[in-house]
């Protein structure tokens, strides 16, 4: 599959493994942006040229270079060091921040998946799978969940009243029928006796 790919279309065709990484080592600011930002430096104390650097890319290049000097092979994977304890929680909550211990834990979970509901409940963030399995999908409340529709309560109340009224009417008709049958039986028995 890799042999069929045309690597010349990649942005950095010398290193296809660095696809979609910024290859910015010294990107000069344009002269219009530089002149616009000169007003920020009072008294004319401003740097002659300003450079942008991709620090992640630069750090990787430096670690690979130091490993070459020390005699380590490039084939060994370069593992980033763990972040310092003083790292802010904002950075740790950033979705682009990847902690190696979390990634290793995820890989460990993938190697040994949970096949029972109890194991899934123990290891999962969503711990109520067994409760969801007990619910009946034929029940309307299963599909509605906690959704609220304005006016739905009043419609339900009207429907309940209508059902109750119809039940009472049926009971009244049955009682009337039973009473009329009893009256006819009593009258017929008195006439023929």
From Swiss-Prot:
Subcellular location: Lysosome membrane; Endoplasmic reticulum membrane
Biological processes, Gene Ontology terms: angiogenesis; apoptotic process; cholesterol homeostasis; exploration behavior; gene expression; homeostasis of number of cells within a tissue; inner ear auditory receptor cell differentiation; inner ear receptor cell differentiation
Protein topology in the membrane: Single-pass membrane protein
Residues the record lists as Phosphoserine modifications: 82
Pfam family membership, one: MINAR1_C
Listed InterPro entries: MINAR1-like, MINAR1-like_C
Sugar attachment sites: 128
GO molecular function: cholesterol binding
TM region(s), chain numbering: 172-192
Cellular component per GO, a single term: stereocilium
Disruption phenotype: In an experimental Parkinson's disease model, homozygous knockout mice lacking Minar2 display severe motor deficits such as rigidity and bradykinesia, gait abnormalities, reduced spontaneous locomotor and exploratory behavior. Homozygous knockout mice lacking Minar2 present with rapidly progressive sensorineural hearing loss (HL) associated with a reduction in outer hair cell stereocilia in the shortest row and degeneration of hair cells at a later age.
Keywords assigned by UniProt, alphabetized: Endoplasmic reticulum, Glycoprotein, Lysosome, Membrane, Phosphoprotein, Transmembrane, Transmembrane helix
Main location: membrane
Expressed in which tissues: Widely expressed in the cortex and Purkinje cells of cerebellum. Expressed in the inner ear, mainly in the hair cells, spiral ganglia, the spiral limbus, and the stria vascularis.
Assembly and binders: Interacts with NOTCH2.
PANTHER family: MAJOR INTRINSICALLY DISORDERED NOTCH2-BINDING RECEPTOR 1 MINAR1 FAMILY MEMBER (PTHR31530), MAJOR INTRINSICALLY DISORDERED NOTCH2-BINDING RECEPTOR 1-LIKE (PTHR31530:SF4)
Membership in a protein family: Belongs to the MINAR family.
Function in brief: Binds cholesterol and may regulate the distribution and homeostasis of cholesterol in hair cells. May play a role in angiogenesis.
Protein's name in the database: Major intrinsically disordered NOTCH2-binding receptor 1-like homolog
Organism in which the protein naturally occurs: Mus musculus
Name of the gene: Minar2
């Amino acid at each position: 599959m890799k042999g069929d790919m045309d690597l010349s279309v990649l942005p950095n065709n010398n290193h296809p493994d660095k696809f979609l990484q910024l290859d910015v080592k010294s990107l000069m600011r344009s002269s219009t942006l530089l002149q616009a930002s000169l007003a920020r430096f009072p008294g004319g104390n401003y740097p002659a040229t300003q450079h942008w650097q991709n620090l992640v890319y630069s750090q990787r290049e430096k670690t690979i270079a130091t490993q070459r000097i020390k005699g380590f092979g490039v084939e060994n994977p370069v593992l980033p060091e763990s972040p310092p304890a003083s790292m802010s929680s904002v950075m740790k909550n950033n979705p682009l921040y990847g902690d190696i211990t979390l990634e290793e834990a995820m890989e460990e979970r993938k190697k040994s998946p949970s096949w029972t509901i109890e194991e899934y409940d123990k290891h999962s963030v969503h711990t109520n799978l067994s409760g969801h399995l007990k619910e009946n999908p034929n029940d309307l409340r299963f599909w509605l969940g906690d959704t609220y529709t304005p006016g739905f309560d009043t419609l339900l109340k009207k429907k309940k009243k209508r059902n109750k009224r119809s039940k009472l009417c049926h009971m009244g008709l049955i009682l009337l029928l039973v009473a009329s049958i009893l009256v006819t039986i009593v009258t017929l028995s008195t006439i023929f006796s």
